[in-house]
Amino acid sequence: MSTGAEIESQERLVVLAEEKELAAPDWSEIRKDTNLKGDLNDTLRQKIQGLSCAKPVGSLTKSTCSFVDSILKTPVLEKNVLAPALNSLYERKAQFYQSLNIPKPLRTRQYICGSGLILSPDHCVTTIRDSLRVGLFLKGVDAALKQLAKENFSEPLHIVYPACGPFAPLLLPLLTYYKNQGIYSPDEINVTFIDIQQGAAIALDALVKQLGLQEYVRNVCCIDACEYQVASDVHMVILEAMQHGFSREGHLRLAKHFADLLHPNGLFLPQNIAVTASLSSAQREYVDQWKTDDTSIHEDMRKERIELGKVLDVNLEFLRTMQEQVIDEHTRIVECSTLAIPYLDPKEGEKTLLFHTRVNVFGEDWLGEYESGITHPLPDSQVCVNFTPQDPRPGDLLVGSGDSLTFYYCMNGLPGFLTTKSDHSDGDKESMLAENGNGN
């Protein structure tokens, strides 16, 4: 198992270049330049952290196994119970990450590519603290492996985990647990990890070695996941590359690519991503309800919403039959649902269009609304519902009672839903307004 000769050589070149630069510093220039001084201090802090951080393989393995064991033995996971144990595990892994002295440019680079936002490794290490998300995925992957084991494949189960980040938090803890408990051997399962960020690949490769999991890992690939090809079967795909409202990151493009690589009897996790739309008051949704409770949505708030219906279900059946329309060399779209806006009393004031995401990880386990950073509702600020903006902006879409909205999912550097108004709704709209005494 390796990250590839090219990654290793690039890593050595970067590290050597950094050492050469610091070998004979121009202290007067550093003193004048606050950015240079800041970079130097960051480097020193990181190296001090590395000196003070013992290689805690024993404690890291023990805490990981304890955390996974508690997840697998708990029928219903609760965020407030998981969080303390996961935070403790995060601190240990964060110390290890700091001790690697990965050059700052490889840790902090964050950019937008043709398929969406690519988060920096420094940002990705914190996602392990999204406790219920991590817990449900670990529980789901374990259940999915048990199901796949019944298929009696003639080869080890091959799991592919694209966009895995530096810690691969949705799978690596399970591998640690399996090895420690003797549950699955490397002859039964092996894994390919993929991440486009070199810093993430370096960190993950080091963590795999630190935990002694090399025999389970087929490769740690530092490539664009959409370019990954393999001649052998893929039996399971684990993918979570999205932000709230199924936006910003390239999950759908990646999911389509790996669905096409998956064995006919393979499993894709999450099994379903359910996106719905509603109309709500932004002030009530995002401000007022959290003044008294910051853990879950108020039932009163849920009742105040005007539910429009399902926008999109992303599951294996959809991915294997997904029809894309090419708009230009940079953008492809997928047509989703058309939903009608019911009658809105003009006195109600403006409404905000919200996209809601729920994630069915595996079986009956769902990651619900507000239970994770990826399941917070996303407002579409360009859709003006039941009002005319005082300061119109490019892209504003004015809609109201009786209008039908057709949603498209855009796959480009800014992935997410595009809302359009359907012309064929005009007749229904006029009838609705007339029935409510608002016709012309």
Spans of model-derived segments:
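Conserved SAM-binding loop
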Residues: L204-D205
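Class I SAM-binding transferase module
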Residues: S2-S59, V81-Q95, P103-G116, P121, ...
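Conserved SAM-binding loop of SAM-dependent methyltransferases across substrates and taxa
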Residues: G165-P186
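Structural motif corresponding to the C-terminal cap of alpha-helices
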Residues: V141-A149, Y178-G182, V208, G212
